[in-house]
Amino acid sequence: MKRTYQPSNIKRKRTHGFRARMATRGGRLVLKRRRAKGRKRLTPTA
């Protein structure tokens, strides 16, 4: 059986990247929450 996680940096950045987050209201709220929480990284690094 094929595993579900097949890593790809392109897919990773397109779905979870900073610009992807900024594109929608929900994504901006995610960043806002992470800033409020004091996260060192707001989005996963590629």
Swiss-Prot record:
PROSITE patterns assigned to the protein according to its UniProt record, in alphabetical order: RIBOSOMAL_L34 (PS00784)
UniProt entry tagged with the keyword Ribonucleoprotein: yes
MF term (GO), any: structural constituent of ribosome
Single GO biological process annotation from the record: translation
Gene Ontology CC annotations of this record: ribonucleoprotein complex; ribosome
Family: Belongs to the bacterial ribosomal protein bL34 family.
Name of this chain's protein: Large ribosomal subunit protein bL34
The species this protein was found in: Halorhodospira halophila (strain DSM 244 / SL1)
Gene field: rpmH
